[in-house]
């Protein structure tokens, strides 16, 4: 199983995804690390990315997912995945990929972003992310998690929902705590 943790910048993707990966002993990949340097510099400079900027990045994420699938590996990956078209690229017809949407108000997320200092994404771009955001629809089968709680509580909610959804599938045995994989 592969879990994509999505949401706007500052929603807690990195923290929740790392907790999920640690709980299951799965691989973890920060989607931001796959951005071309030009994208990072553009965002650092306060310029929102365009679709044309994002397509190569999204294809890299899809390639990462396909590599895990080819090797039979489970993993957790973060990606803002703001539009349905972006999610179609990274999830597509990959039935073993689950989508987790970390949902929160712009005000709450802006406060969180203001408190962090080591990330390239400035708070000034948050409004553009919310303007771009197309929330997942029921046909995408997202696990929607309100980000109002502590990160551990959010991760636990995701674990319970993944276990519930997978109770009758091959993935059920892989949704138990396991050893940490680098």
Go through the PLM ranges and name each one.
Residues 13:
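Conserved lysine of the Walker
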Residues 2:
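Walker A (P-loop) ATP-phosphate-binding motif of ABC ATPase nucleotide-binding domains
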Residues 115-157, 165:
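Small-molecule kinase domains that catalyze NTP-dependent phosphoryl transfer to phosphate-bearing small molecules
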Residues 8:
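P-loop (Walker A) phosphate-binding loop of NTP-binding proteins
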Residues 18-60:
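Conserved substrate/cofactor phosphate-moiety recognition/catalytic segment
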Residues 52-94, 102:
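Glycine-rich phosphate-binding loop used to anchor ATP phosphates in small-molecule kinases
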Residues 5:
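Hydrophobic anchor at the beta1->P-loop junction of P-loop NTPases
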Residues 93-112:
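Conserved phosphate-donor/acceptor-positioning beta-strand/loop module used by diverse small-molecule
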